[in-house]
Amino acid sequence: MDIKGALNRIVNQLDLTTEEMQAVMRQIMTGQCTDAQIGAFLMGMRMKSETIDEIVGAVAVMRELADGVQLPTLKHVVDVVGTGGDGANIFNVSSAASFVVAAAGGKVAKHGNRAVSGKSGSADLLEAAGIYLELTSEQVARCIDTVGVGFMFAQVHHKAMKYAAGPRRELGLRTLFNMLGPLTNPAGVRHQVVGVFTQELCKPLAEVLKRLGSEHVLVVHSRDGLDEFSLAAATHIAELKDGEVREYEVRPEDFGIKSQTLMGLEVDSPQASLELIRDALGRRKTEAGQKAAELIVMNAGPALYAADLATSLHEGIQLAHDALHTGLAREKMDELVAFTAVYREENAQ
């Protein structure tokens, strides 16, 4: 099926099969479609509402065309990632949580990009910290193996995305591609915490990842709108484990964490996000730093559980608390800065 045939189906509110979606995505991602066709396709899909089959097909093609990162093992390797678009503009929680996970003994294959609608994307934050982003796949793999955390810059590993960049920018609306980023980790991780911008996506995306071979995944959305675990409200979870998806909710109090507002955690730049994270991972001299530390732990703990390094969310959160409060997480951030600095010099030659 070509994109014109797909458009004809979509305007008649007919779904595509996984194979049909793969065919259309290959055309888009190899430069065979015009911007008008891509824009019409994305809006048509959104108006119709994307099915699990369609998302599976789109993800499969993006993974196929990605510049992958080969790791010696995927056991205990996890990604902590969100779709973004929650409008909260709080600091980069998932990036900070990644250093805590690494400090607790996990391996983090972090996939991310620059900010689209927010004030600070994961790439923006890490760049502000002095971490070199333009790494080859082999260099990323060494970071993960040696430091315990490595960052895969989406625009480096998903070069075919350039064909959809123009239409996405001109539309200025959430489209299918907002869902695809967290599902297309270049290292092929099978353990993830995926934050989404609406609760309605939790179970469908867990089912998508089940179809694509994931092993232990938490797809989450908090009641206050965050695409991650929150301190201020209950968080809805669709958990994929042992081949089954189940849904439930948790609150901070379930883990001995005080429920509190997110006031003071908003940032207006990557530098502001970095300063808050350094305080949270360091001596926590400010009230905001103390609160940020709690939120980081609330998100790092589930990642340790998803990585099967903890037998429960409660145990994962305790491990994360210990890793943060010993200062090891801050050391991991500094270690990644130093480790990637060597590659900055190598790649400049």
Curated annotation (Swiss-Prot):
Which amino acid positions bind anthranilate 1, per UniProt? G82, N113
Q: What does the record's cofactor remark say about binding?
A: Binds 2 magnesium ions per monomer.
Query: Enzyme class, one word?
Result: transferase
Q: Does the keyword Hydrolase apply?
A: no
In terms of superkingdom, the source organism counts as Bacteria
Listed under catalytic activity are: N-(5-phospho-beta-D-ribosyl)anthranilate + diphosphate = 5-phospho-alpha-D-ribose 1-diphosphate + anthranilate
Could you say which residues bind Mg(2+) 2 here? D227, E228
Instruction: Name any one GO molecular function.
Output: anthranilate phosphoribosyltransferase activity
Which cofactors does this gene product need?
A: Mg(2+)
Q: Which residues bind anthranilate 2?
A: R168
Which Pfam families does this UniProt record tie to the protein? Glycos_trans_3N, Glycos_transf_3
Report if keyword Signal is assigned.
no
Per its UniProt record, what InterPro entries does this chain match? Anthranilate_Pribosyl_Tfrase, Glycosyl_Trfase_fam3, Glycosyl_Trfase_fam3_N_dom, Glycosyl_Trfase_fam3_N_dom_sf, Nuc_phospho_transferase
Q: In which pathway does it act?
A: Amino-acid biosynthesis; L-tryptophan biosynthesis; L-tryptophan from chorismate: step 2/5
Q: Which HAMAP family match?
A: TrpD
What does the record note on quaternary structure? Homodimer.
State the name under which the record lists this protein. Answer: Anthranilate phosphoribosyltransferase
Q: Which organism is it from?
A: Pseudomonas aeruginosa (strain ATCC 15692 / DSM 22644 / CIP 104116 / JCM 14847 / LMG 12228 / 1C / PRS 101 / PAO1)
